[in-house]
From Swiss-Prot:
Residues 23-46 form a propeptide. GO terms for molecular function: ion channel inhibitor activity; toxin activity. Residues 1-22 form the signal peptide. Belongs to the conotoxin O1 superfamily. Expressed by the venom duct. It comes from the Eukaryota. This is Conotoxin ArMKLT2-0251.
Length: 77
């Protein structure tokens, strides 16, 4: 009886972890926080200096890098 209860609790915890992880990763490329922030900040009155393509970057950079892969800035536009 105790083993059954432990197994049920373990399955419930693992299911909850799966659901939490699935919510965070849904449409991550299409609606990333960085692109949403850049869309809100992209106005006619505001000009920002962008990193040139293939320059070194980190995920914390604010220099309008579209995607940072292997520490290189990939700019699509």
């Amino acid at each position: 009886m105790k083993l059954t209860c432990v197994l049920i609790v373990a399955v419930l915890i693992l299911t909850a972890c799966q659901l939490i992880a699935a919510d965070d990763s849904r449409d991550l490329k299409r609606f990333s926080r960085r692109k949403m922030r850049d869309g809100m900040l992209n106005t006619k009155n505001m000009k920002r200096q962008c990193l040139p393509p293939l320059s070194l970057c980190t995920m914390d950079d604010d220099e309008c890098c579209d995607d940072c892969x292997l520490f290189l800035c990939l700019v699509t536009s």
